[in-house]
Amino acid sequence: MRDTDVEVRGDSLRGRHILLGVTGGIAAVDTVRLARELRRHGAQVTVIMTPSAQEIITPLAVRWASQGEVITDWDGDLSGLSDFDAVLVTPATRNLIASFVHGLMNGPLLMALSAARGRGSPIMM
């Protein structure tokens, strides 16, 4: 078993693509554990980190845990932000929640949340 492998605990998320949004709250330190737990239940995990989240935990650590793409900045092609079965944002800072409620889209995470809302995909914060 490699250090990136996870012990499978169930298949409730098998075939599901979960977007994990990470903001700058101190609970961002739990991102590694959460990403690995999602994978233990079969999920494919893609992560979007806000700049403030990157001050708390490194994208390298999150990439290791998720074994998926980690988006940290704007990219010319954001079309992939709508290919998720659900979005989980943790920690969800008051700033992010307020921005989402008011329809702001000033970053990749808010763009993905807007796309998920438009599709009717589950959003958990």
Where would I find each of the regions flagged by the language model?
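A cross-family phosphate/adenosyl-ligand binding-site feature
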Residues: 1-125
